[in-house]
Amino acid sequence: MVKLSFPRELRLLTPNHFNFVFQQPQRAGTPQLTILGRMNSLGYPRIGLTVAKKHVKRAHERNRIKRLTRESFRLRQHSLPAMDFVVIVKKGVQELDNRALTEMLEKLWRRHCRQARAS
């Protein structure tokens, strides 16, 4: 049985972890969302989230976006390549409903999987 938990090891926690991804990222994005990824040597994917107050004013909207993003990652973690991902939220994402945001994330995860196989 495959574990679908989201332990601490699957998160980017320090600024050094984020900077590692920002140095040489593979990008997949839409006007509302960008996912940066960089291969790691750990053998499993990790995720970090950046949801700026500048782009999403209300805390409950920021929390909703982070919750849906973490859930999407948690469900796909075993099909994703061993990469560190940083999800960057841009203006306009709060207008998306939950279904549209989830579908957008799925599309971006698939794009990263294709890019990882190609490289």
UniProtKB/Swiss-Prot annotation:
Keyword Hydrolase on entry: yes
Molecular-function GO terms, alphabetical: 3'-tRNA processing endoribonuclease activity; ribonuclease P activity; tRNA binding
GO cellular component: ribonuclease P complex
Key word Acyltransferase present: no
Transmembrane intervals: none
Record key words, sorted: Endonuclease, Hydrolase, Nuclease, RNA-binding, tRNA processing
Signal peptide: none
Catalytic activities: Endonucleolytic cleavage of RNA, removing 5'-extranucleotides from tRNA precursor
EC number: 3.1.26.5
Database matches in Pfam families: Ribonuclease_P (PF00825)
GO biological process, alphabetically ordered: tRNA 5'-leader removal
Top-level taxonomic group: Bacteria
Described purpose of this protein according to its UniProt entry: RNaseP catalyzes the removal of the 5'-leader sequence from pre-tRNA to produce the mature 5'-terminus. It can also cleave other RNA substrates such as 4.5S RNA. The protein component plays an auxiliary but essential role in vivo by binding to the 5'-leader sequence and broadening the substrate specificity of the ribozyme.
Family classification: Belongs to the RnpA family.
Assembly, per entry: Consists of a catalytic RNA component (M1 or rnpB) and a protein subunit.
Protein name: Ribonuclease P protein component
Gene name tied to this protein: rnpA
